[in-house]
A protein has these predicted regions:
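Short, flexible, surface-exposed loop segments at domain boundaries
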Residues: 23, 232-233
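Cysteine-centric segments in proteins
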Residues: 30-58, 66-75, 92-216, 231, ...
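A generic structural motif
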Residues: 224-226
Length: 250
C-alpha cells in the first residue's frame, strides 16, 4: 500500500525538524520569552564547523535580554547580561571580560527576553545534579513546560565552581580536565571555591537538547562574578544555601 498523504507530510515535517535542529535553527520563533537559537552543538560536533551563525551586533540588547554562547572559531565565550554583551577571549589569566567588537560573530548562541521573574531561596546547599533537578521541579510548579527551553538566573555563593573559556588555540588533554573535552579548541580552565556571583543559564528541554546544550545534557550555564568582570562557560558547580533562583514568568 502506498503511503498516505498524511504519512508523507509527517515524514517531511520530521525531516525538516531534524535538518533545522542540526543547522541550529529558526524553530525557535514563536516560543516563550522570545527564545532564539543560533548554531548547534550537535552539528558542530559532527562537522567541526565553528563558523559564525549570527553577528553579535544583530543580537537583542534591550533590558531583559539574556544569552549565552561562544564566538566563531571557538575563540571566546559570550554572555548577554540584561542587554549588555560581555565577551571573554581567554586572554586574561583572571578571566576578565571585554566589550564585543563590531566584527564578532557567534558559532553557538541562545537568547531570551524576560520581563518578569519569579524568585525564591534555595533551601539548602545542593550539588549540580540535585540543583538542576530542583530547577526543573520549580519550573513545573509555576507552569513552565519542561519539554521547552527557558532561561533562569541564580545569585549567591557557590562553594565549588569550575568554568572555562575557549581560546581557539589547539586543544590538549589538560584542557579537558575541568569539564567538557572540546576537540575543536583549547580552553583556559578556572577552578574556584566559595565565589559569589550569578549563573545565567538556559534549560534546553527535549526540543533543543544538543542544540543549545551539549548532546545528552539539558543545561547551558555561564558564570559571571559579582563585579560583572569575569565570566565563562560552567562545567561543574555547587550552589550554596540561600542562593536566589529566578525563573521566568509567562
Amino acid at each position: 500500500m502506498p503511503p498516505s498523504r498524511k504519512s508523507l507530510n509527517k515524514a517531511a515535517t520530521c525531516s525538516l525538524l531534524i535538518a533545522c535542529l542540526l543547522a541550529g535553527s529558526a524553530l525557535a520563533s514563536g516560543l516563550l520569552f522570545d527564545f532564539a537559537a543560533f548554531g548547534s552543538f550537535k552539528r558542530m560536533n559532527h562537522t567541526g564547523d565553528t563558523s559564525g551563525q549570527v553577528r553579535l551586533a544583530d543580537l537583542p540588547k534591550a533590558a531583559g535580554a539574556w544569552g549565552v554562547g561562544a564566538l566563531s572559531g571557538l575563540t571566546g565565550e559570550i554572555l548577554l547580561h540584561d542587554g549588555r554583551l560581555l565577551v571573554n577571549r581567554g586572554e586574561d589569566h583572571r578571566g576578565r571580560v571585554s566589550d564585543a567588537r563590531p566584527e564578532d560573530e557567534a558559532a553557538i548562541f541562545a537568547s531570551a527576553r524576560v520581563r518578569q521573574w519569579a524568585e525564591g531561596p534555595l533551601p539548602k546547599e545542593m550539588p549540580q545534579a540535585e540543583f538542576e533537578a530542583f530547577v526543573v521541579e520549580q519550573a513545573k510548579k509555576i507552569g513552565l513546560d519542561a519539554e521547552h527551553p527557558f532561561p533562569f538566573l541564580v545569585d549567591g555563593i557557590f562553594p565549588a565552581m569550575t568554568w572555562h573559556v575557549v581560546t581557539g588555540k589547539p586543544s590538549s588533554p589538560a584542557h579537558g580536565a575541568g569539564g567538557h573535552v572540546n576537540k575543536h579548541a583549547g580552553m583556559r580552565v578556572f577552578e574556584q571555591s566559595g565565589v559569589s556571583g550569578r549563573l545565567v543559564a538556559f534549560y534546553s528541554g527535549s526540543r533543543f537538547e544538543g542544540v543549545v546544550s551539549h548532546p545528552g545534557e539539558r543545561f547551558h550555564i555561564h558564570y559571571v562574578d559579582a563585579a560583572r568582570e569575569a565570566s565563562g562557560h560552567v562545567d561543574a558547580y555547587r550552589v550554596g544555601s540561600g542562593a536566589t533562583l529566578r525563573l521566568p514568568v509567562k
